[in-house]
Amino acid sequence: MAELACFCYPHLENDSYKFIPFNNLAIKCMLTAKVDRKDQDKFYNSIIYGIAPPPQFKKRYNTNDNSRGMNYETSMFNKVAVLICEALNSIKVTQSDVANVLSRVVSVRHLENLVLRRENHQDVLFHSKELLLKSVLIAIGHSKEIETTATAEGGEIVFQNAAFTMWKLTYLEHKLMPILDQNFIEYKITVNEDKPISESHVKELIAELRWQYNKFAVITHGKGHYRVVKYSSVANHADRVYATFKSNNKNGNVLEFNLLDQRIIWQNWYAFTSSMKQGNTLDICKKLLFQKMKRESNPFKGLSTDRKMDEVSQIGI
């Protein structure tokens, strides 16, 4: 995760702003600079290489002292920064909006995936600039539309029906902020269209999840799509979701947290996010993740549980 101010800076033209991507030499200069505390939140002028991000965001970049940040010296950083600028320059951002826009925390991996989709000649985003920009504006939280299959970050499709598409995420192969844990495995489910979904299509998805992904929890980050994650990583997701929710509220980026379909979401996660929306502390909310929940009656009585052992997934074992 990183703020948009880590990728670009605003330049006033007439009554609105144009956004310009940082170059990696300017960032490198900022990372070595001694800056007064009162200037930590201001864009840094490297003199030689142009404007750099505010020094308060130093920890967002990978250095000898911080291996958890972005690999800003890769070509992928420049591609992501350019893509963000293209999207921001397609809309009007005024002086009253610019600080709010640049403070938005975005998923770096999501944006890298959109770059990969853009470069794939077989992908619809390669052929449609309008759909590409729409996808980016959704990813950076500017659009109130949800991420559907056409505007999704992408990955490897492992399941699809008339209503849903399930993607295996490819973060292990990323350049900008790869996941280093080789045991990482995670999926995302997007709706094909933002419209009411028939019970039969929900039933098909639940059957697929029950038999092929029975070692995983289905959760949501509140953005209109589902995530299918290992139970061992649920607490980590909870910390991130709670921190983002609080940060957005603090910065005035109040986005509706979408709880999604309770029949699909893991019961404990639904309880956690509901408690979070009510304003409870992180500790109170997280207790619900480890609490034994009363099993609800099967919402789909026709969904058979009669399967042979060799049909049950071994994924995640």
Swiss-Prot record:
GO terms for biological process: viral genome replication. This is Non-structural protein 2. Belongs to the rotavirus NSP2 family. GO terms for cellular component: host cell cytoplasm. Homooctamer. Interacts with VP1; this interaction is weak. Interacts with NSP5; this interaction leads to up-regulation of NSP5 phosphorylation and formation of viral factories. Interacts with host DCP1A, DCP1B, DDX6, EDC4 and EIF2S1/eIF2-alpha; these interactions are probably part of the sequestration of some host SGs and PBs proteins in viral factories. Its cofactor is Mg(2+). GO terms for molecular function: ATP binding; metal ion binding; nucleoside diphosphate kinase activity; ribonucleoside triphosphate phosphatase activity; RNA binding. Residues 205-241 are annotated as: RNA-binding. Participates in replication and packaging of the viral genome. Plays a crucial role, together with NSP5, in the formation of virus factories (viroplasms), which are large inclusions in the host cytoplasm where replication intermediates are assembled and viral RNA replication takes place. Displays ssRNA binding, NTPase, RNA triphosphatase (RTPase) and ATP-independent helix-unwinding activities. The unwinding activity may prepare and organize plus-strand RNAs for packaging and replication by removing interfering secondary structures. Its main location: host cell. It comes from Rotavirus A (strain RVA/Cow/United Kingdom/UK/1975/G6P7[5]) (RV-A). It is found in: Host cytoplasm. Keywords: ATP-binding, Host cytoplasm, Hydrolase, Magnesium, Metal-binding, Nucleotide-binding, RNA-binding. ATP binds at S107, V108, R109, K188, H221, G222, K223, R227. The active site is at H225 (for ntpase and rtpase activities). Its EC number is 3.6.4.-.
